[in-house]
Regions:
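N-terminal intrinsically disordered/low-complexity leader segments
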Residues: 1-21, 32
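Helix-turn-helix
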Residues: 25, 33-67, 71
Length: 214
């Protein structure tokens, strides 16, 4: 998994399957607790109780609460990388890849609502003791390189290069596209009944028309 490379054990060895599974369990429980009670009320004890383990087990795997929070944030990137790039790669044309980017990104948000709630809590309430900027948490150089796959500018440029897309300012269009996709997060957090599939369809139609080479 992506975040397995973020932190090695203090003994400098790779984790066993059992250790990896335990970390994933603790991360999932941390997400649930943060989403349910808010970050200010989240403690290692509550997370350990949710997982049915001792607090010492949580600290063994993550060292500190900050270490656990970094792993929670890294898991967000992992989930996105497991969802969006494969969907794009399965598509054949650049138009289909654009649609796949939009649909898979919104599907990722739709199927990870507890994570979104937890991350919203962390974004407003969590201050890392390390002094890191929130946007840098959970990132490694390797992971940052992999996250470049989530930048729609790449597929937009590819579409122009093949002649499938017309001319348009790629960077500005990519920013607008990302903003439109990411806007669904606040919407679904405020309105759980929001029709994300219709929203996906609308965005696909709008941006396909915008970039299509007539």
């Amino acid at each position: 998994m992506i975040y397995n490379s973020i932190m090695r054990s203090k003994r400098g060895r790779d984790r066993t399957f059992t250790e990896t599974a335990r970390r994933q369990q603790i991360i999932a429980c941390a997400i649930d607790v943060i989403a349910e009670v808010g970050y200010p009320q989240t403690t290692i004890r509550k997370i350990a109780d949710r997982a049915g383990i001792a607090m010492s087990v949580v600290l063994y795997h993550f060292g500190t609460k900050d270490g656990l929070i970094e792993a929670v944030i890294a898991s967000k990137y992992q989930a996105a990388l497991e969802t969006v790039p494969p969907a794009i790669n399965r598509a054949r044309t650049q138009t289909d890849k654009l649609a796949a980017y939009i649909r898979s990104s919104i599907d990722y948000f739709d199927t990870h609502r507890p994570q979104l709630t937890a991350l919203a809590q962390l974004g407003t309430s969590y201050k890392p003791h390390s002094g890191k900027h929130f946007g840098d948490l959970g990132l490694t150089p390797e992971l940052s390189e992999q996250l470049a796959q989530l930048d729609p500018a790449t597929l937009l440029r590819a579409g122009q290069k093949t002649g499938e897309f017309c001319y348009f300012p790629v960077d500005s269009t990519a920013i607008a596209l990302q903003a439109a996709v990411n806007a669904v997060v606040e919407k679904i957090l405020r309105d759980p009944e929001f029709d994300v599939h219709r929203y996906s369809d609308d965005l696909v139609k709008m941006f396909s028309r915008m970039v299509r080479n007539a």
